[in-house]
Swiss-Prot record:
It comes from Staphylococcus phage 80alpha. The gene is gp46. In the 80alpha procapsid the C-terminal 21 residues of SP form a helix-and-hook motif that interacts extensively with the major capsid protein, especially with the N-arm (approximately residues 26-70 in the capsid protein). Found in the procapsid with the major capsid protein in a 2:1 capsid protein:scaffold protein molecular ratio. Residues 173-192 have a biased composition (Polar residues). Residues 186-206 are annotated as: Helix-and-hook motif. Disulfide bonds: none annotated. Residues 1-13 form a propeptide. It comes from the Viruses. GO terms for biological process: symbiont-mediated suppression of host innate immune response. Changing residue 198 to I: Defective in producing infectious virions. Residues 25-38, 83-127 have a biased composition (Basic and acidic residues). Keywords: Host-virus interaction, Inhibition of host innate immune response by virus, Late protein, Viral capsid assembly, Viral immunoevasion, Viral release from host cell. This is Capsid assembly scaffolding protein. When the gene is mutated the virus becomes resistant to the host CBASS CdnE-Cap15 system without altering the production of 3',2'-cGAMP or cabRNA by host CdnE; the host Cap15 effector protein seems to be activated but the virus still completes its replication cycle.
């Protein structure tokens, strides 16, 4: 009944990259993919920049997944060890052992209930921030304490939005002031907000 939990502080998500090809860097590459900002101006997202953003997030998710896998293996080894220990016990020892295990299971159920409640709250906070609230992300930010979970949600939301903002700034600097295909003014009546731009680029999702 043990459940994998990823316990970590997402403050490192806020670190700004020095890679010139990542959002916030100084890379200047072409082949743009255009989107609009909230002023109705088309924003250029180069494939290289989008690839870098995706790689950063994927690496960090993979890192936490690896930790979760290692945690699961440790728990499996502990379970095998306990089974071998139980096989060597006499009746009284087994009764005492089983009683202790039952108490642990009850405590685990209480912890799981609390964890599920925190997952629901974390998903709500991510949705309100217009950030991806999938099970994978929720499992990354949720810990066994409400305070740390809230801190993780805020750090993750801010980091993703910062990456999008930096990409917008970089593309604005790279685009020519007049003419060209990479930076044009739009006259559409319905501007896209930050979340809509990011959602189309697979960074922020509903």
């Amino acid at each position: 009944m043990e459940e994998n939990k990823l316990k970590f502080n997402l403050q490192f998500f806020a670190d700004q990259s020095d890679d010139p090809d990542e959002p916030g860097g100084d890379g200047k590459k072409g082949n743009p993919d255009k989107k609009e900002n909230d002023e109705g101006t088309e924003i250029t997202f180069t494939p290289e920049q989008q690839k870098k953003v995706d790689e950063i997030l994927e690496r960090r998710v993979a890192h936490e997944k690896k930790k979760a896998d290692e945690y699961a293996k440790e728990k499996a080894a502990e379970a095998a060890k306990e089974a071998a220990k139980l096989a060597k016990m006499n009746k009284d020892q087994k009764d005492e052992y089983e009683r202790e295990q039952m108490e642990k299971e009850l405590e685990q159920l209480r912890s799981e209930k609390q964890l599920n409640e925190m997952r629901s709250e974390a998903r709500k906070m991510l949705s309100e921030a217009e950030v991806d609230s999938s099970d994978e992300v929720v499992n990354l930010v949720v810990t066994d304490t409400a305070e740390q979970t809230k801190s993780n949600v805020e750090a993750f939301s801010n980091a993703v939005k910062k990456a999008v903002n930096e990409a917008v700034k970089v593309n604005a600097r790279q685009s020519p002031l007049t003419g060209g295909d990479s930076f044009n003014h739009s006259t559409k009546n319905k501007p896209q907000n930050l979340a809509e731009i990011a959602r189309q680029k697979r960074i922020i999702k509903n």
